Design a protein with these regions (language model features):
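Long, leucine- and charge-enriched amphipathic alpha-helices
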Residues: 132-136
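Structural signal for interior beta-strand "rungs" in well-ordered beta-sheet cores
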Residues: 1-127
Length: 136
């Protein structure tokens, strides 16, 4: 994982002691990066599919039955619920909670938590109905 702090003279790397846990029936595409956890574990739960070029940062937890399209990036310590679908090239900021059954449109930038069953898109990502209304 990517973990540094500055001591005013130089940058110092702190060790990551967590592990990566990959559940059953998980598919991981080509050129993915999955960082080990810093103080806790990085987890990809059962029946989740990662397309190519997905980055999963330290301490991320991805739930069951998720489908993640190519070039999605998860910043550290974000929790993704079960049955979540994320379109290609979406970016998910760190320390967020994404609820169960959420759908995130491709190219979206998620900078806030998303409640369960919501559908979002855009940057910043917002409810799809609000996005369409504001972008006509």
């Amino acid at each position: 994982g990517f973990g540094f702090f500055s001591n005013n003279k130089n940058n110092v790397r702190y060790p990551h002691i967590g592990i990566v846990i990959i559940g059953n029936n998980v598919e991981i595409g080509c050129n993915n990066i999955i960082d080990r956890g810093s103080m806790s574990n990085t987890i990809i739960d059962n029946n989740t599919y990662l397309d190519n070029q997905v980055h999963v940062a330290h301490n991320v937890k991805i739930g069951k039955n998720c489908i993640i399209a190519g070039q999605v990036g998860f910043a550290g310590s974000t929790t993704i619920g079960n049955n979540v679908m994320i379109g290609g090239q979406a970016g998910i900021s760190g320390h967020l909670n994404i609820g169960d059954n959420v759908k995130i449109g491709g190219g979206s930038g998620v900078i806030d938590d998303i409640s369960k069953n919501d559908k979002v898109m855009g940057y910043p990502a917002k409810n799809i109905k609000k996005f369409i209304k504001n972008n006509q």
